[in-house]
Amino acid sequence: MSTLTGARRRANSALMRLYGLWAIRHVQHGRSYRWRGLTLSVPTGVFHPGLFFSSGVLAAEIERRKPVGLSVLDVGCGSGLLSLAAARAGATVTAVDINIEAVRATAANAAANGLTVEVVPSDLFGELGDRRFDLVVVNPPYFAKDPADDAERAWFAGADLGYFEQFFAALGDHLSVGSQLGRALMVLSEGCDMGVIAAAAQRHGFRMAVTSRTRVWLGMQVVWVIDAARPA
């Protein structure tokens, strides 16, 4: 049974990878997208939340947690769905993306929906200085391949999945401390290499626990909550 499950997951992962490549190369025109009353304009070259399930799954989890009054950082914001969901739910939101088109799209979409989101061009946490946040949300790339351009950065995490090493290495410096300990929410497909990702988290003092699972086409989207590991 476990072998069949593993084979099925590998097949789903391969299909999702092919679908991602199709989406990157064949969606050549900007288009709009609606999610629970939010309207987003998604330009060419920016991750489209309507073509994948992950963003909607994580946005729903953000809303479910009711982050009223929390400071939220959206890492790799794309067209801004997670940022807009958090802002509408009452959070103070900062969004970052290395893709300048994504930065512009998130800023424009926030304004068009009457929401306030601070948007910063940044490779992960690089341009945030010593700022800390109560909640970090991320829909990361997770396929093992070096991205060829900004569009592929939304999908490919480096040949050795180095994205996750960089993310966890810097995460602790940007989570709130004191009475309001910061945490992160990350959405991943069940087909990704959780061994590598969890090992990177552990190396940098974090633990990952499943908070929700949502069955979608070609498998499951899993939302993980990430906290600082407690001493044994």
Please tell me what each predicted stretch does.
Residues 35, 67, 112-114, 179, ...:
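Short, well-ordered coil/turn elements that cap or connect secondary structure elements
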